[in-house]
Amino acid sequence: MKLTLRHAVPADVPTLRVLIDTSVRGLQAADYTPAPIEGALQSVYGVDSQLIADGTCYVVETGDASVVACGGWSKRKTLFGGDRWTAREDALLNPQQDAAKIRAFFVHPNWVRRGIGSMILEACEKAAAAAGFTRLEMGATLTGVPFYSAKGYVVLESIEALLKNGESLAVVRMEKRNGSG
């Protein structure tokens, strides 16, 4: 099946909301219990409109125009979190000293292990390099750590994101030198 990578646009937001919910519920249950998943869906996980406005969010769609994955990179300080996440820092980064942020990767459970996440990650890494960034950083879910490790990212630290429902979500801060694999 033909897959197309393109920049996300504001009209994609309703579709992305459904994709994110489906991806999280379908893929993260092995790594998180229901309470943190629900809390994260109400606060951390979600569409980041700033990524779309900045032109740094991508979607992959099938031949019938169904969006099956999304992900992006950011030139802003926010490490993770959608529009509802209160710990956002939208100040711009300095490419000479800061790491670009890899952000908001979600793949539909029926479309995993087909190279789609790799396709988006490669586009993000190339775009960040073109913008002058030599390092990349992310807040990965426990579910995503094996994928990112295989792509050359190394673990820096574990973070507990406090959620509105009183739960916490384990997030792993990872980094890579851009162009290193």
Question: What is the meaning of each model-derived region?
Answer:
Residues M1-P14, G179-G181:
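Conserved N-terminal entry element of GNAT/NAT acetyltransferase domains
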Residues L16, D48:
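Hydrophobic pocket/interface hotspot
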Residues D21-G46:
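Conserved GNAT-fold acetyl-CoA-binding loop/helix
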Residues D54, S66-V112, E122, A127, ...:
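Conserved acyl-donor/pantetheine-binding loop and adjacent beta-alpha core of acyl/acetyltransferases
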Residues C57-T62:
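Cytosolic beta-strand hydrophobic patch enriched in CBS
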Residues G115-G117:
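Conserved G/P- and acidic residue-centered "switch" motifs that form tight phosphate/ATP-binding loops
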Residues T134, M138-V145, K151, E157, ...:
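C-terminal "cap" of GNAT-fold acetyltransferases
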